Amino acid sequence: MDRRYLFLLASTRRDGNSEQLARRAAAQLPAGTSTTWLRLDEHPLPPFVDLRHSSGYGDPEGTARELAEATVAATDLVIVSPVYWYSLPAAAKLYFDHWSAWMRSPALKLRERMAGKRLWVVLVDSDQAHEGSAAPVLDSLRRTADFMDMTLAGALVGHGSKPGEALQDAAVAAAADTFFRSGPA
């Protein structure tokens, strides 16, 4: 089966540290590997409203449909994000909130279609490596993968604030070069 990677860029900063790290890692994928890069700020979702116990959900429409279809079409979902206040940026959190609706869409069947797929995480925080500010994000995404019967295939964490700082760390740059060859996190 051909692999199809969906890179979801959660930063509002173009060419920021997390994107640079992800692009370096993606450059090492085998030639011909399908990659799709979507910026969540260019695909804004409406506010999420929990309708589980009232009217229920219809099929996603507009931008939500585009993101949902790209998500289920991928074999590998790559979340590319800075760490904001020990969490994902709002656009990424909103994307995952919408999964609650997409799981209940009879046409989409998100949970069934995501089972067995791989979730990859590329994060950059502004702390030092030993401070662990990315840990809450990684825990949340690990739990998401478990709930969806996905495999958390790898987590690449860099540290930096100004664009380019994360790749100045030789160990992080080297990890990016082999990231998609790693086993489950």
Q: Where are the language model's segments positioned?
A:
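Residue-level signal for alpha-helical context at structural boundaries
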Residues: R23, T36, L110-R113, V137, ...
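Short, basic/glycine-rich phosphate-binding loops at helix/coil junctions
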Residues: P44-V49, W120-V121, L156-V157
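Short histidine/acidic/glycine/proline-rich micro-motifs that form metal-
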Residues: T12-D15, V83-Y86, S126-H130, S161-G164
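Short, glycine-/small-residue-rich phosphate/pyrophosphate-handling segment
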Residues: L108-A153
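Short, solvent-exposed coil/turn elements at secondary-structure transition points
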Residues: D41-H43, D125, G158-S161
